Regions:
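Autoinhibitory propeptides
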Residues: 38-113, 123-134, 437, 454
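Secreted peptidase-domain scaffold signal
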Residues: 254, 269-312, 318, 584-595
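C-terminal subdomain of the subtilisin-like protease fold in secreted/lumenal serine endopeptidases
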Residues: 222-235, 239-244, 256-263, 269-272, ...
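Catalytic-core environment of secreted peptidases
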Residues: 144-160, 317-321, 347, 361-362, ...
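Hydrolase catalytic cores
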Residues: 176-179, 184, 198-209, 214-223, ...
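Subtilisin-like serine protease catalytic core
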Residues: 102-209, 224, 254-256, 270-271, ...
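C-terminal outer-membrane/trafficking sorting elements
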Residues: 596-653
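Active-site core segment of subtilase-fold serine proteases
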Residues: 121-173, 177, 190, 322-416, ...
């Protein structure tokens, strides 16, 4: 079944030959925003203004705001969010969990709901089909945030008609395959192969992601099962202290699901500057570079966060990369809360030699009500047309100087997707707080990656070949994001195989990009690297823990991970490794209460049918007393059994 929900007064016509949406010509477009609402009057005012309210937790609301008319060239102020196993499961003997060697019986996520919030799902890829050919993806929810549309699909017929959310994306398919794909007879199965799956897809706005989290939680409640949610996307801008509305909302969702987020893949990118002002260093300067490394076109956003509510002074300049000097100084600005300034430079100014840039920049100031910190944002879309003579890059670059009083500090974050930071006047941009802002919440699990394959398979001229990767097995990956936050928390919380992992590949993307290499095993597969791959690996194994102990809370899981993280690897002092490497088996055993006890009996066959026994859960609750033959009706799991004066642990099949 396909369910369309227009989050407002839109209409829809569904026909067997396809899906057609009838939207009025003058229907508004929307901008997704997360806001805090303080009283009922604010709520009514927003509704009267045409704001669509999707979900809320406490006083934090997920909203769609009607877009006001604005210049088509005006830079967007929305944060940029980007989608950041056969071998992987051999590390720390992780596959022992699925094989039953880790705890006496196999754990495969049975009785658990796993979900993703992503983009590019192929719900009928063979890796998601059960033995009867039906998809184990029980529900797909798609958000088209800017159109104000929510689509819910339940079942294979709906998936067949709908096909996919984006034929030009495959990320969700790959991630979900790692999380819970069966492998479809290949060696490339995922982790929680018996879990129920919910896939939510969107354009990766914060609102779309969080609404998807709520959809997964709703389904888990409907079926009465625990939930694990994976979010393999990231964002470089933001306060990086866990106070954003996104982080606060997600922390509340952690009451109802265990949530894992990728740390990001910017661990080798210089997108951050952290500077404490002093008499000797009263300011810090930097240049804006693009990720094409040519600086001809600058598009994106950069934020400068103060440590207090006091705004910092920002001086805008233009740097001449040929003469290595400041060529123009636009001015010095101190942006109070709510201030905004727009700059526009046209072609005629450039042609007349008056100014070397063509385009637009918006600078705004704000004090975050969530943490009391002031931040200045630069959002821009401009060209630097003149090349450096004999070089492949632009002559003129945009430069910024930030000044503050001694003892104050600034954190500068480039968006990383389009913009990087370049040093100036002795400054040294670095990746030392490259962790995704989305993964800075206090009750989420941030996932870094380590290398696990030096060779990856792909199909070439009908033959499967092994292609060298740039990664070493069981080695630190410098691209994995990391950082110590303002409150001292070290991220990521844990690190797992992710460089690279072979998983499912969207058939729709394959058809659109037939020239791109992939592994053809009757259905398409792909070797891909990133913390996006490590995150569902961790989430999948957490699902096996929840199968064993359904009552585990998010706080329990975080504590188990911290207690069992491994540090017996090379370069264990490298900050890319965060709090340590993930050990699925040790985590499962800790969840079950083993705590290193290996002498327990593991077979119910040691008991005679008429023996009197008392059975306790691993948390100590007495759940049975009577003849041993009565145990045959109990659910499978690990229990403590008291027989006369002896105590043993037994695994019930």
């Amino acid at each position: 079944m396909i369910r369309y929900k227009f989050v407002g007064l839109l209409t829809c016509l569904i026909m067997s030959a396809g899906i057609f949406c009838a939207v009025a010509d003058d229907a508004a477009a929307f901008e997704p925003k997360i806001i805090r609402i303080h009283d009922e009057s604010e709520l009514h005012s927003l509704e009267e203004a045409g704001v669509r309210l999707l979900r809320h937790r406490g006083d934090i609301y997920l909203c769609l705001f009607p877009l006001q008319e604005r210049m088509a060239t005006s830079p967007s102020r929305i944060r940029r969010i980007t989608p950041s196993l056969d071998v992987a499961k051999t590390y720390y003997d992780a596959f022992a969990i699925q094989e039953g060697r880790a705890a006496g019986i196999p754990y495969t996520g049975n009785g658990v709901v796993v979900g993703i919030c992503d983009i590019g799902i192929d719900p009928l890829h063979p890796t998601f089909l059960d033995a009867d050919g039906k998809s184990r993806i029980k529900r797909v929810v798609q958000y088209k945030e800017k159109e104000g549309i929510r689509i819910q699909l339940d079942g294979d017929d709906a998936y067949q008609e709908w096909k996919t959310d984006d034929t030009d994306k495959y990320h969700a398919t790959h991630v979900c395959g790692i999380l819970a794909g069966s492998g479809a007879g290949t060696p490339y199965s995922g982790i929680a192969t018996d879990a129920e799956i919910v896939a939510t897809v969107s354009t990766l706005s914060e609102v779309g992601l969080l609404a998807g989290v709520e959809d997964i939680i709703d389904y888990a409640r409907e079926v009465g099962k625990p939930a694990v949610i994976n979010i393999s996307v990231g964002c470089n801008t933001g306060p990086h202290d866990g106070t954003s509305l996104f982080s606060q909302y997600l922390d509340m969702c952690a009451d109802d699901a265990v949530i894992v987020l990728s740390a990001g893949n910017e661990g080798s990118h210089n997108n951050t500057i952290m500077h404490t002002f002093s008499e000797a260093a009263p300011s810090v300067s930097f240049r804006l570079g693009n990720t094409a490394w040519d600086e001809f076109h600058m598009y994106g956003a950069t934020e400068m966060w103060s440590g207090s509510s006091r705004p910092l002074s920002v001086i805008l300049k233009v740097y001449d990369s040929v003469e290595r000097r400041i060529a123009f100084e636009i001015g010095e600005f101190t942006m109070a809360d709510g201030d905004e300034i727009s700059f526009s430079w046209d072609e005629s100014d450039f042609s007349a030699g008056l100014f070397p840039l063509v385009g637009e920049l918006v600078m705004s100031g704000e004090v975050s009500p969530e943490n009391g910190r002031h931040f200045t944002t630069l959002a821009y879309d401009f060209q630097s047309p003149e090349p450096a003579e004999g070089k492949g890059w632009a002559r003129y670059e945009f430069a910024v100087e930030v000044a503050g009083k001694p003892g104050e500090d600034v954190e500068v974050y480039a968006d990383g997707t389009y913009t990087r930071l370049v040093g100036l006047a002795g400054s040294r941009p670095s990746p030392e707080r490259s962790i995704s802002d989305l993964a800075c919440g206090r009750r989420v699990i941030s996932a870094g990656m380590y290398g696990n394959r030096s060779l990856s398979p792909e199909t070439s001229d009908g033959e499967i070949i092994e292609v060298p990767t740039r990664y070493e097995e069981a080695a630190t990956v410098v691209h994995s994001s990391y950082g110590t936050l303002r409150d001292g928390r070290v991220t990521p919380l844990t690190v797992a195989p992710g460089a690279p992992v072979v998983s499912a590949y969207s058939r729709y993307y394959r058809d659109l990009h037939a020239d791109e290499p992939y592994l053809d095993l009757g259905s398409p597969w792909l070797s891909e690297s990133g913390t996006s791959m490590a995150s569902p690996y961790i989430a999948g194994y957490i699902a096996t823990w929840l199968e064993a102990v359904p009552g585990l809370t998010t706080d329990d899981v975080i504590r188990i991970i911290l207690d069992t993280n491994r540090t017996d690897f090379a370069d264990n002092s490298d900050p890319h490794n965060g709090m340590g490497w993930f050990d699925p088996v040790a985590g499962l055993r800790r969840a079950l209460g083993w705590n290193g006890v290996d002498s327990a009996a593991d077979s119910i066959g040691m008991l005679s049918p008429d023996d009197y026994v008392e059975v306790y859960s691993m948390t100590g609750a007495k759940i049975y007393a009577g003849a041993a033959k009565g145990l045959s009706g109990m659910s499978k799991g690990l229990y403590v059994v008291r027989l006369a004066s002896s105590v043993m642990k037994v695994a019930l099949p």
